[in-house]
Each structure stands twice: as structure tokens, then as C-alpha cells.
């Protein structure tokens, strides 16, 4: 039986009526305590990131503005770097938000990794995407624990590339939240990267 993650991705694509470009030939999975990332070496971007968010994960730790995103993938083909985003017009958009790991400085710091970011427009990153992050934290407080999935989406059309290493810019993002005890989906968002 397909996992809830795969069922959510398939359902969102069908409901949106978009044509989704999917290449799974070069995926590697990164397992971290804070999140899991299925990283696409051909796009130099996560294909999906998922994590459990508990009410106890949300704390008072503040992010340090001097933190840079580190290249954390032990594969010579994973060449995306913090500098690829510099002067590109795109933000380094967290998929698993730093604030979801604000119970500890070390946990928050570990979200600053290339396996956990994708190019997002400033309007999306500081607007609707931020609202999905806040909504998920509220849901975690209400339900004590939720699971979250964030998926960059490339449409069947021209793709923009940024940086020296040519990172592929997603056309849209999907995020979903569900209850771990019974896989009940409680929230789904589909947002265009503009």
C-alpha cells in the first residue's frame, strides 16, 4: 500500500490539474533527527521533505541571522551551495522550518542545510509559505503531534536555474499535514512560486 506521503502527492497533482515533471532516477534520502529529505541530484533540490512536529518541538530559541546553509549531503554530485542563492532574486526557503525545531539551538541549526531548502520567491517565502508554517505549528499545539510533508513541484514547462551550480527553481510547492495515529489529513496547501 502506498504511503500517506505518496498518496498525498498523487492526490494533489490530480486535483490541481497540472502536469508534473517527475524524475526519480537520481534520488538520495537524507535521514536527520529533525527531518527526512528525498534529495534530487538532477535538480539540486529536495524532491520532498517530511517530519513529525510535536507541540514540544516549538520553543523559544531564536535563529542567528549570521547562520549560513551548509552542504550536508555526502555525495559528490550534491553540489548546491549557500552561494548559489546569492543575488539570484530567490530566498533560501526552508522546507522543514527552523522554528519547528526551536526547542534547541542545535536542532534549529541543523535545519540550515542544503537538503532542506529550495529557491522561493521573497513574496512566497515571507507570505503564504510562512502562513503554512504558522498554521502547522498551531495544528501541532492543538493535536499534540502532526506529520508534515513539503514538496517542491516542477511543471511541464521551462524551468529557471540559479547559481553557479544551476539549481532548478520549483514552479510551485505543496504542503500537507496529517495526524500520525490514523493518517487523517487535516490541511493541504498548493502554492505557486511567484
Set out the residue ranges of the language-model regions:
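Short, His- and charge-rich active-site/binding loops that engage polyanionic ligands
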Residues: 28-91
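Bacterial N-terminal signal peptides
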Residues: 10-19
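Bacterial N-terminal signal peptides that target proteins for export
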Residues: 1-10
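A short hydrophobic/aromatic micro-motif that marks alpha-helical segments and, especially, helix-coil
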Residues: 20-21, 109
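Domain-level detector of nuclease and nuclease-like folds
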Residues: 75-194
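Boundary at the C-terminal end of the N-terminal hydrophobic targeting segment
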Residues: 21-27
Amino acid at each position: 500500500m502506498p504511503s500517506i506521503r505518496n498518496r498525498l502527492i498523487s492526490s494533489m497533482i490530480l486535483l490541481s490539474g497540472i502536469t508534473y515533471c517527475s524524475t526519480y532516477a537520481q534520488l538520495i534520502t537524507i535521514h536527520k533527527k529533525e527531518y527526512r529529505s528525498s534529495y534530487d541530484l538532477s535538480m539540486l533540490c529536495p524532491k520532498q521533505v517530511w517530519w513529525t512536529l510535536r507541540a514540544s518541538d516549538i520553543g523559544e530559541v531564536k535563529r542567528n541571522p549570521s547562520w549560513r546553509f551548509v552542504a550536508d549531503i555526502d555525495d559528490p554530485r550534491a553540489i548546491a551551495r549557500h552561494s548559489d542563492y546569492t543575488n539570484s532574486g530567490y530566498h533560501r526557503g526552508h522546507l522543514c522550518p527552523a522554528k519547528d525545531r526551536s526547542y534547541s539551538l542545535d536542532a534549529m541549526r541543523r535545519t540550515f542545510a542544503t537538503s532542506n531548502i529550495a529557491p522561493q520567491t521573497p513574496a512566497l517565502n515571507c507570505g503564504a509559505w510562512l502562513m503554512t508554517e504558522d498554521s502547522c505549528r498551531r495544528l501541532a499545539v492543538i493535536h499534540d503531534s502532526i506529520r508534515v510533508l513539503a514538496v517542491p513541484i516542477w511543471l511541464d514547462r521551462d524551468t529557471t536555474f540559479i547559481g553557479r551550480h544551476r539549481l532548478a527553481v520549483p514552479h510551485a510547492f505543496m504542503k500537507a499535514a496529517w495526524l500520525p495515529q490514523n493518517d487523517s489529513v487535516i490541511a493541504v496547501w498548493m502554492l505557486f512560486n511567484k
